[in-house]
């Protein structure tokens, strides 16, 4: 507790006046409050007067600077907390810097470890090989396309289905035709679409794969995209100006396949991009005929309505 001794002239006021110090730095001005309280409610009257100096004493903690004679707020620890916060922020920054350095060191160490492993693996494998096997390996510094390919099993098609994009690029860079076909006259793009490998599809198209080539049955990549329900692939193929009305050997267009698979979204996309509703298959079927053949159910009605009311090329 802080004790104070204050001398008040008796003629000034009948009620005791309590000194209220300014919370920051009051010099020699004291604000007095004349207060009366009735059950917790008070009426305060403020007045300012200049009085003589008073002396504050505190046996445990001095809180008065005697030279300037003013109240001093007790230390609430706020400055210390701010200092700690600053230290913590500095610590966080240092930790981030250290972590970044650690990541760089770790990355370099990982690359070094990988290089060392590859060298050790090469030495180990060459020791395991028979002399004639070692000769074959030494003769094929680049991929031997004839040795790794048959008419049924083409390396590019296999890698497309297994999503080995880097190895695909390696073969293409070493002379393999990106549109190389297998016994079914299907390219790697055909296979990727059938397997719904969207990343491979995009990569092959960017590398120059032909999206118009038809396989042994006359099916183009868009036929297979519609068949497997790959809506995003269908949209992507339209960006490469594929023929929406291309027909296979039996006269089936992508629209016929979309209705057969009862895929409303793809049917609508095809119609939006100019699919011809009047095109017939070689046995005379319209896309509408295929929709009616499924009987009376919701999807049939939905497709029939779409085919009846939506003009070709409507957006």
Swiss-Prot record:
It comes from the Eukaryota. ANK repeats lie at residues 151-180, 184-213, 217-246, 250-279, 283-307. Residues 44-65 have a biased composition (Polar residues). GO terms for cellular component: chloroplast. Disulfide bonds: none annotated. The keyword Isomerase does not apply. Residues 72-104 have a biased composition (Acidic residues). Residues 1-39 form a transit peptide. Pfam families: Ank_2. Residues 44-106 are annotated as: Disordered. SMART domains: ANK. SUPFAM superfamilies: Ankyrin repeat. Keywords: ANK repeat, Chloroplast, Plastid, Repeat, Transit peptide. Expressed in roots, inflorescence stems, flowers, siliques, dry seeds and mature cauline leaves. PANTHER family: ANKYRIN REPEAT DOMAIN-CONTAINING PROTEIN EMB506, CHLOROPLASTIC, ANKYRIN REPEAT FAMILY PROTEIN. This is Ankyrin repeat domain-containing protein EMB506, chloroplastic. It comes from Arabidopsis thaliana. The gene is EMB506.
């Amino acid at each position: 507790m802080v004790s104070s001794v204050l001398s008040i002239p008796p003629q000034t006021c009948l009620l005791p006046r309590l000194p209220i110090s300014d919370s920051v730095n009051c010099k020699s001005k004291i604000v007095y409050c004349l207060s009366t309280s009735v059950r917790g409610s008070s009426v305060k009257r403020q007045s300012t007067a200049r009085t003589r100096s008073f002396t504050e004493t505190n046996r445990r903690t001095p809180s008065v600077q005697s030279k300037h004679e003013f109240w001093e707020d007790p230390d609430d620890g706020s400055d210390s907390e701010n200092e700690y916060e600053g230290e913590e922020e500095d610590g966080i920054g240092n930790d981030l810097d250290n972590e970044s350095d650690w990541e760089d060191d770790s990355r370099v160490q990982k690359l070094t470890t990988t290089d060392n492993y590859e060298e050790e693996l090469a030495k180990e494998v060459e020791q395991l090989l028979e002399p004639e096997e070692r000769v074959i390996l030494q003769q094929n510094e680049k991929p031997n396309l004839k040795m790794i390919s048959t008419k049924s099993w083409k390396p590019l098609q296999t890698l497309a289905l297994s999503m080995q994009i880097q190895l695909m690029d390696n073969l293409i860079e070493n002379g393999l035709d990106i549109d190389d076909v297998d016994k079914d006259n299907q390219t790697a793009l055909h296979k990727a679409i059938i397997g719904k490998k969207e990343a491979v599809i995009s990569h092959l198209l960017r590398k120059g794969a032909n999206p118009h080539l038809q396989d042994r049955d006359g099916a183009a990549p868009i036929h297979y995209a519609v068949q497997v329900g790959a809506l995003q692939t269908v949209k992507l193929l339209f960006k490469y100006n594929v023929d929406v009305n291309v027909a296979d050997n039996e006269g089936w267009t992508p629209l016929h396949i979309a209705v057969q698979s009862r895929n409303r979204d793809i049917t609508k996309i095809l119609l939006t991009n100019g699919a011809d509703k009047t095109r017939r298959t070689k046995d005379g079927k319209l896309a509408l005929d295929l929709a009616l053949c499924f009987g009376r159910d919701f999807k049939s009605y939905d497709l029939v309505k779409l085919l009846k009311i939506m003009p070709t090329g409507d957006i």
